[in-house]
Amino acid sequence: MGKLFGTDGIRGIVGENLTADLAFRVGQAIAVVLQEEKGSRPTVVIGKDTRISSDMLESALMAGICDMGGDVKPVGTIPTPAVAYLSRQERADAGIVISASHNPYEHNGIKVFSGQGYKLSDAVEARIEERILSDAPMKHRTRGEIGRRHHGMRQLKRDYIDFVASTIESDLAGLKILADCANGAAYHIAPDVYHELGATAVSYTHLRAHETLANLV
């Protein structure tokens, strides 16, 4: 285990040991290492939870990746498994989830998947961490070498909803369901999944996104 990466990525209290500056540096390092691995411009899928700090960290990560010539596909607020699935489906070089799971809202984290949707190898993770902690400046890209943010990613959420629904064989027609979305990242995925499975009478608790009450993601 490294100085930054724990068993579940980089985690900390936002504004203390997890800052926008660090997230920018993490984005830079990920793009550089992926480019070394691939030999060409990398693409990264990014998702996040509902925490108040997730937007800020997402922006910093995307800026760092683009600064080093990587492209990003932000899919917005979405459950962690969705990023693993979409990274593989989109043939991306990596996926990033901004989340600290069940931890209190002041915490957040940066979890990185491989392009196959699995945990990064220890070797690649170590190279990324070495870049982050190095005092050597990274060479900024210029002109056409700068990375881009892809737009129109709403369809990717739809793809994940369809995938989840396809894995459930039960017909929910006529069932009354109570779903607790815990103010988390599934808050706008769950209703569509239940609808596709035929449920017509569904009640939700903690459905809306809540920046300081994200319980489970």
Residue spans for each PLM region:
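Phosphate- and divalent-cation-binding pockets in alpha/beta enzyme and binding domains
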Residues: 56, 82, 188-189, 215
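Single conserved hydrophobic/aromatic residue that forms the stacking wall/gate
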Residues: 206-217
